Amino acid sequence: MNFLRKMMKTCRDDESSKPLDPSAPPDDDDLWLPPPEYVPLHEISSKGNTRNFCISGEVKICSPNGYSFKIIRHILRSFESVYSGNRRMIGLVKVVIGLTLSGSPVPEGMNWVYKLRKTLVFQWSNSSGPLEGEELEYSQEITWDDDSEYVGLQIRVNAKQCHIAGRSWCVNMNSRACQLWSDMTLKTQQSEEDEHTSVLIE
């Protein structure tokens, strides 16, 4: 049975239905240490293929019966096969999704909304990444439904290259973000110029 598929359902509230209290945000009920190649990034010393992006990320979770990160992680493990955005920026999108879902959710009707607004520094290998000046406006809904439970993710990522000083994108290895990056098979490698820097290869 195909558990991950696009549905006609949406996360919009039904205006005619009785308002319901959203379920509590999930606990970290599925914690584990990510693979060792996900090393924390420090200040990037290399100037090759490094770009600053002003980022706006949002993940809205719709689940009438509540949700856990076990289900979210299950959905994100198939992210590569359902991603509909610019393939040159899939690595950036994965990073932003992980960082966004590491924040605190805000209730919005029956939904929980995670938001991220930051200026971040990304470094790609020479053959990967966006073109000079390229921007991204990505929006997609991914749903999971097994006839007894429904979870929908509405993902929006806007990224514009900018000259504002930003921070490198990796966070504590033990964080939820690194777990989600591993689930989405984020592809990185260690920089040849800086042993403390990871480089995106997608």
From Swiss-Prot:
GO cellular component: host cell endomembrane system; membrane; viral envelope; virion membrane
Other remarks on this protein: Most abundant protein in the virion.
Region called Disordered, residue ranges: 1-31
GO annotation terms (biological process): viral budding via host ESCRT complex
UniProt xrefs under Gene3D superfamilies: Rhabdovirus matrix protein M2 (3.10.460.20)
Top-level taxon in the UniProt lineage: Viruses
Taxonomic lineage of the native organism: Viruses, Riboviria, Orthornavirae, Negarnaviricota, Haploviricotina
Residue ranges of the TM segments: none
Topology of the protein relative to the lipid bilayer: Peripheral membrane protein
Function comment: Plays a major role in assembly and budding of virion. Completely covers the ribonucleoprotein coil and keep it in condensed bullet-shaped form. Inhibits viral transcription and stimulates replication. Plays a major role in early induction of TRAIL-mediated apoptosis in infected neurons.
InterPro entries linked: Rhabdo_M, Rhabdovirus_M_sf
Entry comment, domain topic: Late-budding domains (L domains) are short sequence motifs essential for viral particle budding. They recruit proteins of the host ESCRT machinery (Endosomal Sorting Complex Required for Transport) or ESCRT-associated proteins. Matrix protein contains one L domain: a PPXY motif which potentially interacts with the WW domain 3 of NEDD4 E3 ubiquitin ligase (Potential).
An annotated Gene Ontology molecular function: structural constituent of virion
Name listed for the protein in its UniProt record: Matrix protein
Motif (PPXY motif): 35-38
Start and end residues of each stretch annotated as Essential for glycoprotein binding: 115-151
Record-stated family: Belongs to the lyssavirus matrix protein family.
Keywords: Host membrane, Host-virus interaction, Membrane, Phosphoprotein, Viral budding, Viral budding via the host ESCRT complexes, Viral envelope protein, Viral matrix protein, Viral release from host cell, Virion
Quaternary structure note: Homomultimer. Interacts with nucleoprotein and with the cytoplasmic domain of glycoprotein.
Places the protein is found: Virion membrane; Host endomembrane system
